[in-house]
Amino acid sequence: MSKAAKKKSSKKRSGSEAAQFDQKTIQEFKEAFGIMDQNKDGIIDKSDLKDLYASMGQIAPDSQIDAMIKEASGPINFTVFLTLFGERLTGTDPEATIIGAFAMFDKKDCGKIKEDDLIKILQNKRGEPLDEDEVKAMYKGKPPIEGGEVDYKAFAHLITTGAQDELASA
């Protein structure tokens, strides 16, 4: 198969990624897209990503944002967004997905984020925020927080293995 045929073939496959998700998952992607589309124009662009990082108290370098934008072949509407994430999530487990999300806030690339950042993420009004009682319940379970830093890999493991019940009921 020629390089051009392979390229064309792989592009064809990527469009079917959306078909692999159930309605609940697609709704979750819509909510995530809505959070990222800060100006609500139906397209995620550089300014949306900058605003998203700023809302989380982060400053992302232009090079990092440009790299994110370049992953798409054109404007990032919901269909493109779903396809990009579909390609990434195929064969991945929820724990790896959550770790990847937390890693965006790991400035030092050390496997930890600030406890304050975790609370901001969990209480972000643009998604499905946890209320004060839910945050208090999380702390009763003794999440992996030490010295004001969260081991987000251990935290992701807890919430994806059913241990969140232990967190809430401890």
Swiss-Prot record:
Q: How does it assemble?
A: Myosin is a hexamer of 2 heavy chains and 4 light chains (two regulatory light chains and two essential light chains).
> What keywords are annotated for this sequence in UniProt?
Calcium, Metal-binding, Motor protein, Muscle protein, Myosin, Repeat
As a miscellaneous remark, the entry gives: This chain binds calcium.
Which of this chain's residues are annotated to bind Ca(2+)? 37, 39, 41, 48
Domain named EF-hand is located at 24-59, 93-128
**What InterPro entries does its record include?**
EF-hand-dom_pair, EF_Hand_1_Ca_BS, EF_hand_dom, Myosin_RLC
Q: Ranges of Basic residues compositional bias? A: 1-13
Q: Name one GO molecular function term.
A: myosin heavy chain binding
Q: Which PROSITE patterns match?
A: EF_HAND_1, EF_HAND_2
Name it: Myosin regulatory light chain 1
Spell out the GO cellular component terms annotated for this protein, sorted alphabetically and separated by semicolons: cytoplasm; muscle myosin complex; myosin II complex
Q: Which organism is it from?
A: Caenorhabditis elegans
Quick one: where's region Disordered?
1-22
Q: Per the UniProt entry, what is one GO biological process?
A: regulation of muscle contraction
